[in-house]
Amino acid sequence: MPPPSDIVKVAIEWPGAYPKLMEIDQKKPLSAIIKEVCDGWSLANHEYFALQHADSSNFYITEKNRNEIKNGTILRLTTSPAQNAQQLHERIQSSSMDAKLEALKDLASLSRDVTFAQEFINLDGISLLTQMVESGTERYQKLQKIMKPCFGDMLSFTLTAFVELMDHGIVSWDTFSVAFIKKIASFVNKSAIDISILQRSLAILESMVLNSHDLYQKVAQEITIGQLIPHLQGTDQEIQTYTIAVINALFLKAPDERRQEMANILAQKQLRYIILTHVIRAQRAINNEMAHQLYVLQVLTFNLLEDRMMTKMDPQDQAQRDIIFELRRIAFDAESEPNNSSGSMEKRKSMYTRDYKKLGFINHVNPAMDFTQTPPGMLALDNMLYFAKHHQDAYIRIVLENSSREDKHECPFGRSSIELTKMLCEILKVGELPSETCNDFHPMFFTHDRSFEEFFCICIQLLNKTWKEMRATSEDFNKVMQVVKEQVMRALTTKPSSLDQFKSKLQNLSYTEILKIRQSERMNQEDFQSRPILELKEKIQPEILELIKQQRLNRLVEGTCFRKLNARRRQDKFWYCRLSPNHKVLHYGDLEESPQGEVPHDSLQDKLPVADIKAVVTGKDCPHMKEKGALKQNKEVLELAFSILYDSNCQLNFIAPDKHEYCIWTDGLNALLGKDMMSDLTRNDLDTLLSMEIKLRLLDLENIQIPDAPPPIPKEPSNYDFVYDCN
């Protein structure tokens, strides 16, 4: 007879004694269990003791997390969190450098546990650490020359403990002094400092900026972009990542009036070129966290365009009207417009109206009215002027080429530019905040200081080319825009490394090629809608679904590394989960770093029997998505969240690294529970595999027309005299 579900069998260690095998009754209070363990080893004052995991996490067992204890778990009897916090609080103030160093090392490790962190913070431990950072450097300045390694380790452990303690969100960031901020900033500003100290200092500065408006002001006074740039020119990708994260944080929290100023500083300091040279084109792979920070920087840079995108043109503003006059002048090189009053006003108005019509504006009389719609507002006019000035030959050619065509066949440059600018803003999501999980950056946008304008210049020439290839008329304007959008989107998915490469990709995506792609997709769709094919699909679909199911389960057996997210930032903290080969148990556990390849089952400390799983929930239904916090409200995170519910009020919470892994895991878990696999990935895989299988089966019928209906059954004969009776 199996043991009751409330009983778990564990091993408990105590230094200097043989481990004990015990059965823990989860219905009993934790204090009663600890007393029982202490009595077994004849230890008095059981209230001074606690249980913690014996694995590398060393997390304390509490009433909140005790349900995570599984059969076979190894626990350790140790001093209680309150006692441990009190002892460490005293030890880190020791006059002995060795004792202080050892205490800070222990503190850095234990601070990851929220139970211990709460007790240490209650002793005003955060203030003690900040005082050590502020004054400790001066106090031990004389010792640095003879004890430099010891001093570096001490400061590193102090900052690590501080980061871990603050990461729990117990203490407000607004409580820190200017002296502390200056000290942290000084570590970042030093040219030669220990890597671990630099990394933690950058992490602290980023958190200060993101979590407090007041601290943003103070950090911005202490740290300049020029002081951060040398860290990007190094070879340590983690330092580069944290440096860009600080720049992004300063950018994100800057007041509107300061963002453009900051962008100008970034341009002066050649930040883009340095990132392109030392990060994007460095001889090493870009990890996910770096890709995310580059994506954030890309989004924040493009969001600088939002102000112009949402600004309507003022038809009465002479400076703005002069831009339109400049477009006309460059295009038609107006021959010494009479400065005197010789030409009549009516003649000049007529000439302007004719030229504005050639420029493709909708309102020929007052083209300023074309820019009153937002988006794209004044951004469209900015793009047109940039194209006219920096690609003058192409601009003049397009305008004159179209002005010489028949009215109905001309590609209106003005209208096209306005609609194209609006479309490009939609593609690049200008004005939207960066996602917490996305890492979709485009290297080509880091190759030019005016990348959006250059992007526009390439696309407006593409639009003109596509217009000619389609032999379009004014009625076809929307169709042309749809084709151009498809061309741009298909070229962007290839992630070109430069704007020139993007241009060459577009050359290969002519209107004829787009038609071929569309026709191929349409033919495939039509071919597979006939009745015989649909019947064949229905027959082989169960085989394909079984194949997909096996692939999903095989991927779960291989396992996936999940990233632990919190309200502060995306951390380099990982945990791994994989299914046992017999599909009966999920093995999972924390990791110190991202693994290279599969993690063996033996190294994963925790187990969850598949038979115990009650349900799999996703999105807002997940327990960890119902918690309060800025991160939890993010739409992208919600779309990647899922949870396994088991036992009573127990859950295993996941946030997938990307949409693909989310689909793999939700499909696989549903398959284990005997439920349908409902993800988009399953639908796509099913369509692809069904299509391939049907094509393979129909190879022998090539060029043979398959009828839509079976042949008719012939009429019965008039008599059956032809029947031969063997008897």
Swiss-Prot record:
Keyword Cytoplasm listed: yes
Sorted UniProt keywords: Acetylation, Apoptosis, Cell membrane, Cytoplasm, Membrane, Phagocytosis, Phosphoprotein, SH3-binding
Any Gene Ontology biological process: apoptotic process
Residue interval(s) of motif SH3-binding: 707-714
Residues modified to N6-acetyllysine: 100, 105
SUPFAM superfamilies, per database record: ARM repeat, PH domain-like
Major subcellular site: cytoplasm
Residue intervals of the ELMO domain: 319-492
Subcellular location: Cytoplasm; Cell membrane
GO CC aspect terms: cytoplasm; glutamatergic synapse; guanyl-nucleotide exchange factor complex; plasma membrane; postsynapse
Record's function text: Involved in cytoskeletal rearrangements required for phagocytosis of apoptotic cells and cell motility. Acts in association with DOCK1 and CRK. Was initially proposed to be required in complex with DOCK1 to activate Rac Rho small GTPases. May enhance the guanine nucleotide exchange factor (GEF) activity of DOCK1.
Listed name of the protein: Engulfment and cell motility protein 1
Organism: Mus musculus (Mouse)
Lineage: Eukaryota, Metazoa, Chordata, Craniata, Vertebrata
